[in-house]
Amino acid sequence: MKAGIHPDYKKVVFMDTNTGFKFLSGSTKGSNETVEWEDGNTYPLLKVEISSDSHPFYTGRQKFATADGRVDRFNKKYGLK
């Protein structure tokens, strides 16, 4: 492998913004935010919207979007359905 062309692989903390669940993993992505982990070390903090703690496949709870789509708005506007 060529030297100097591969990104640095380091440990980071991922935080689910919906539930507050945090887990330590490896990643090449960095962050300016840091957090102190359970082992006393400080790691970069990466915020994610969905993780295994909040995804319906893993939790068994179905979550429906409340936003109306274009078709729904059209039907409401013209009194269809």
From Swiss-Prot:
A Gene Ontology cellular-component term: ribosome
Keywords from the named record: Ribonucleoprotein, Ribosomal protein
Residues annotated as transmembrane: none
A biological-process GO annotation: translation
GO MF, one annotated term: structural constituent of ribosome
Keyword Ribonucleoprotein appears in the UniProt entry: yes
Record flagged with keyword tRNA-binding: no
PANTHER family: 50S RIBOSOMAL PROTEIN L31, CHLOROPLASTIC, LARGE RIBOSOMAL SUBUNIT PROTEIN BL31C
Membership in a protein family: Belongs to the bacterial ribosomal protein bL31 family. Type B subfamily.
UniProt subunit comment: Part of the 50S ribosomal subunit.
Protein's recorded name: Large ribosomal subunit protein bL31B
Organismal lineage: Bacteria, Bacillati, Bacillota, Bacilli, Bacillales
